[in-house]
Amino acid sequence: MQLTLWTYEGPPHIGAMRVAAAMNGLHYVLHAPQGDTYADLLFTMIERRDSRPPVTYTTFQARDLGADTAELFKRAAAEAYARFRPQAMIVGASCTAELLQDDPAGLARALGLPIPVIPLDLPAYQRKENWGASETFYRLVRALAGPPAARPARAVRSCNILGPTALGFRNRDDLREVRQLLDRLGIPVNVVAPLGASPADLARLGEADFNVVLYPEVARAAAQFLERTHRQPFVEIAPIGVRATRAFVEAVAARAGVDPAPVLADEGSRLPWYARSVDSTYLTGKRVFVFGDATHAVAAARVATAELGFALVGLGTYAREFAREVREEAEAHGLTALVSDDYLAVEEAIAAAQPELVLGTQMERHIAKRLGIPCAVISAPMHVQDVPARHAPQMGFEGANVLFDTLVHPLMMGLEEHLLAMFRDDPEFHDGVAPSHLGGTARDLPAAAPQPAALVWAIEAERELKKVPFFVRGKARSNTERFARERSLPLITVETLYDAKAHFSR
């Protein structure tokens, strides 16, 4: 067992809760101790939902372990049905209750409820949250989608949209953008699931001609099942960035039998022109490290390199089930992917890569802050500030605009650097002190890594080093000292500084 202060994913029953909370008319009866009710806060606090997720906990306590905990579950399930009258119910156990081996599936079946009861077998000690969401959605689709039915020939084929859940990164806004794209193409949407769907809606999934998978982490297994049983092909292109959105539009248009040209001719994204118009000194070649779930990490890496001209120096994911996709993308950039859910390993990799920008999760925001590196959150897990009240998608052409702002705004642009150069030697405003209205206390700059042997810097070289922007000054210092040490130079001069810069720029 590994003790940690942070985890990228919760146990699999949290994934099941994300699916249940996204749907209507579905209730989740969870065999869990009293302490596991903390999960409600993920939805009411982080996502700021105005209602609790549709979950009934058995909430057994220590004193109940000497009695019949199975009876507790049966009573909770019966009361949940009587109170909420759902169209369907899912039942399962949390990681703690799994140890009791009470068999929630068999207990619920014995109750003989007049609705579908779908048991969930979520091995909490082998799997995690995203897998739990995928397995839950797959089980629901398998149980409720109904037998395959003949579909009439149509001039324009319809689709289902699969994947968006509660507590997903910008899922609500992404769905709005994708629906607008499909509307502009004239493609009818049959069902959106899990978000906003009911069990009755899942029974209509087979009426569509194909499926659109927005988030493979959640919907790939269900889409593969529908492809096998209902002969529904699926499109699995995450439309994140201008290029991916164009590819998505062409793919769904081909499946539906419509012309994508009108939509592509009027895409309305400002990212391509903005990326070309920004001074390349402050955009092109910026070193970026990307980490997150597979869908968002791979997409962010492609946008950063192909559309903004950044240099990718690190790519990784915490989602082991999708490690192959991330490794393939990393290899395309000449990198080795980091596949780990240990935030300390991620911090070590970021520090070693010395990026100028980090794109990651809420944890990478903390890591980057400690290292003094700009950061933008592009993937779950996220915190409350990453669930904005405004419309802020990542998908579609408007999502590309949002993504441009997200990736570029943390960077220091030309005017800001020019102002720093103007006031570098000012006793009140130079970058070695905090803002004057905060009392002028010294800035806690990230210290350079300790070196085995002390090196002497000439006064002129130190003065020249201060002209380097503070957020890459540590990197410039360490590279120069490494250059001097490798050549046994006793004194670092201005010439040494520029020789080192030329050496490491090759």
UniProtKB/Swiss-Prot annotation:
Q: By its UniProt entry, which Pfam families does this protein fall under?
A: Oxidored_nitro, PCP_red
Residues holding [4Fe-4S] cluster = 36
The note describing how and how many cofactors are bound reads: Binds 1 [4Fe-4S] cluster per heterodimer. The cluster is bound at the heterodimer interface by residues from both subunits.
Q: In which pathway does it act?
A: Porphyrin-containing compound metabolism; bacteriochlorophyll biosynthesis (light-independent)
User: Which GO molecular function annotations are given, in alphabetical order?
Assistant: 4 iron, 4 sulfur cluster binding; ATP binding; metal ion binding; oxidoreductase activity, acting on iron-sulfur proteins as donors; oxidoreductase activity, acting on the CH-CH group of donors, iron-sulfur protein as acceptor
Identify the keywords attached in UniProt to this record, alphabetized: 4Fe-4S, ATP-binding, Bacteriochlorophyll biosynthesis, Chlorophyll biosynthesis, Iron, Iron-sulfur, Metal-binding, Nucleotide-binding, Oxidoreductase, Photosynthesis
Gene Ontology annotations of biological process type: light-independent bacteriochlorophyll biosynthetic process; photosynthesis, dark reaction
Gene that this polypeptide is encoded by:
bchB
Q: Say which domain of life the source belongs to.
A: Bacteria
The function of this protein is: Component of the dark-operative protochlorophyllide reductase (DPOR) that uses Mg-ATP and reduced ferredoxin to reduce ring D of protochlorophyllide (Pchlide) to form chlorophyllide a (Chlide). This reaction is light-independent. The NB-protein (BchN-BchB) is the catalytic component of the complex.
Active site positions:
279 (proton donor)
Query: What broad class of enzyme is this?
Result: oxidoreductase
The UniProt catalytic activity note for this protein reads: chlorophyllide a + oxidized 2[4Fe-4S]-[ferredoxin] + 2 ADP + 2 phosphate = protochlorophyllide a + reduced 2[4Fe-4S]-[ferredoxin] + 2 ATP + 2 H2O
Q: What is its EC number?
A: 1.3.7.7
Q: Which cofactors go with this protein?
A: [4Fe-4S] cluster
According to the record's subunit comment, the protein's assembly and interactions are:
Protochlorophyllide reductase is composed of three subunits; BchL, BchN and BchB. Forms a heterotetramer of two BchB and two BchN subunits.
Question: What organism does the record attribute this protein to?
Answer: Methylobacterium sp. (strain 4-46)
Q: Output this protein's name.
A: Light-independent protochlorophyllide reductase subunit B
